Amino acid sequence: MTSAPIFYRLPSVPKLSVTIITRNEAEHIAAAIDSAAWADEVLVVDCGSTDATLEIACARGATVLSREWSGYVDQKNFAAARASHDWIFSLDADERIPPPLAAEIRALLATEPPRRGYRLPRVTFHLGRWVRTTDFYPDFQTRLYDRRAARWNGRYVHESVAVDGPVGRLRHELEHYSFRDLRDQVERLNHYTTLAARQMHEAGRRAGPLDLIVHPPAAFLRNYVLRRGFMDGTVGLTISAMAAYAVFLKFAKLWELQRTRVAESAPQSQSET
């Protein structure tokens, strides 16, 4: 009498969705999607682009959804929730997944990953070179995660993925093409410092003359000396100076917010009747 054959169930290989949130990213979206073409799904969530972003994304084979803007955190959580697979790689439109990083992620997902989230270094291309000094590097980002055990958190700026349990680390870099030029950097810093000041103001932070005097030079020294910006010559000097400028703007805008709030709460003088 022959015994019945024994079948062993092989563990399933997790599939991956790459999510990208966009608005008017026609300049970047094709390269971003192409760098993620190896994934099982590329999902683009767009919020009202008026350029060719949607047409390019569709032509590149991405799944495209449209949704009104609700903030970085909510938009990224929405993208993760609408993805087809539980494992998510959150990619910004101005970022690229180079082949070494793609291979590392695929190898990790070939077996059941031991962690529910992974962070990785990000390298930024700015002013004609890859910058591996200042606060630009290694700029660790948690981007690969299991949505069943992780969510995006934060308010206006500095959103991040909160993972239930320890976070693993990937070795290869994510590429970041953040600014076209210095003019673009100044415009973006103006926007982000407004959001940062608002976030600090709502958290009860206050700013005074000492903050404007102390924090900007400290930011410059941290970037130029401690983070070795001097090794990148004029590029490192410029980035360090821009970091100081951004910190000054943030605290100046915070001071302006609290000053405006005080003025609005002051009793109004009434004309005599």
Which residues are covered by each model-predicted region?
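A conserved acidic beta->alpha catalytic loop
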Residues: 35, 46-55, 92
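Short, well-formed alpha-helical segments that are part of the catalytic scaffolds
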Residues: 20-38
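Cell-envelope/extracellular polymer assembly enzymes that use nucleotide-activated donors
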Residues: 15-17
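Acidic helix N-cap motif at the loop->helix transition within catalytic regions
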Residues: 27-30, 51-60, 100-101
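Conserved donor nucleotide-binding strand/loop of the catalytic core
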Residues: 54-82
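Catalytic metal- and UDP-sugar-binding loop of GT-A-like glycosyltransferases, i.e.
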Residues: 45, 67, 89-93
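Catalytic-site signature of metal-activated, phosphate-bearing donor transferases
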Residues: 74-81, 86-89, 98-261, 272
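Aromatic (phenylalanine/tyrosine) cluster motif
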Residues: 7-8
